[in-house]
Amino acid sequence: MSHFFAHLSRLKLINRWPLMRNVRTENVSEHSLQVAFVAHALAIIKNRKFSGNVNAERIALLAMYHDASEVITGDLPTPIKYHNPHIAREYKKIEKIAQKKLLEMLPAELQEDFRPILDDSQHTEEEISIVKQADALCAYLKCLEELSAGNSEFNLAKARLEKTLAARHSQEMDYFMTVFVPGFSLSLDEISLDIPD
């Protein structure tokens, strides 16, 4: 018997942004799906507009599982995780152990199929970069949504994420920011005005 998917189903019980007041609580499961949507879009944009040659479906899959180890480690708040290089290094080691534990939960005959997804040492630098861009973008979008709902608690997080996005800058991210991000600050009525008949 394998408890792999029973564990993954518990990602919905792990709340993100645990130290901050949230107008709407976000869990790791829904965050992972949004990161998969955005990473897939970034990969397609890269391929179509900027002469990229990445596997958009694989990148979406990597993004879907990018926080899977948190079902074992929990979600450590970013300011703590990156407080200093020593903590960041040690937490990375903990994530590797959690990835290995997750993989070992699978039946032996399935482990080699999941290893390239769960073991981030088997991801290319380009794949990692796109998933990290999508992850940061989704955190930024969460800040915009919270700020639009009147929650000033996310002001500093938004400023920090703007720096992160600038550091991870890419043409596909610029395109996504220009074309898709403005809608996240609008109301349902405002975004519904553009729906074709």
Curated annotation (Swiss-Prot):
Protein residues bound to substrate: R16, W17, H31, D67, D75, L76, P77, T78, D135
Enzyme class: hydrolase
NCBIfam families documented for this protein: PRK03826.1
Family (UniProt): Belongs to the 5DNU family.
PANTHER family for this protein: 5'-DEOXYNUCLEOTIDASE HDDC2
Gene name tied to this protein: yfbR
Residues reported to bind a divalent metal cation: H31, H66, D67, D135
Function field: Catalyzes the strictly specific dephosphorylation of 2'-deoxyribonucleoside 5'-monophosphates.
Domain of life according to the entry: Bacteria
Record keywords, A-Z: Cytoplasm, Hydrolase, Metal-binding, Nucleotide-binding
Assembly, per entry: Homodimer.
Name this protein carries in UniProt: 5'-deoxynucleotidase yfbR
HD domain residues: 28-140
Subcellular location: Cytoplasm
Lineage, top ranks: Bacteria, Pseudomonadati, Pseudomonadota, Gammaproteobacteria, Enterobacterales
Entry's EC annotation: 3.1.3.89
Annotated organism of origin: Photorhabdus temperata
InterPro entries named among the record's database cross-references: HD/PDEase_dom, HD_domain, YfbR, YfbR/HDDC2
